[in-house]
Design a protein with these regions (language model features):
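Divalent metal-dependent catalytic cores for phosphoryl transfer on phosphate-bearing substrates
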Residues: 1-82
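Terminal helices and disordered tails flanking the catalytic cores of nucleotide-processing hydrolases
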Residues: 52-126
Length: 126
């Protein structure tokens, strides 16, 4: 509802607002899926967003598993090769902060969702 009002205040037309709201509503790992190009793009962008700067709390002792994984990621590159219709997510994880397996524990469902979103867009997720 908040996004809808913001988009409305920005002057976006009703059809486009509806499309964006549908994409937002379908990007949750538990219940969402790609239902349009916009929703597929949102899923790819959202589910690949892992990086140290997402962690506001800098007290490592108080980190939960998500904070540790995000904080351990020191580099994230989302690379789109239009000619080959391929997306590559290149991540560097400092495994002195958390093991790489913790990343997969948290991000496996997100990765699967991204795979289906890429398939919807007829691109290869690398």
């Amino acid at each position: 509802i908040l996004a809808y009002e913001i988009l409305k205040d920005m002057g976006m037309n009703l059809e486009d607002r509806t499309e964006v709201m549908m994409a937002i509503g379908n990007h949750d790992e538990a219940t969402g899926t790609a239902v349009s190009d916009i929703s597929a793009a949102l899923i790819l962008a959202d589910k690949s967003d892992v990086h140290r700067n997402r962690v506001r709390n800098r007290d490592i002792v108080t980190f939960d598993k998500h904070d540790k994984v995000n904080y351990a990621v020191t580099k994230t590159d989302f690379i789109m090769d239009r000619e080959k219709r391929k997306v590559t997510l290149d991540i560097t994880i400092d495994n002195t902060i958390c093991p790489v397996l913790d990343y997969f524990d948290i991000f496996m469902e997100r990765t699967k969702m991204s795979k289906y979103a890429a398939k919807y867009l007829n691109i290869w997720l690398n």
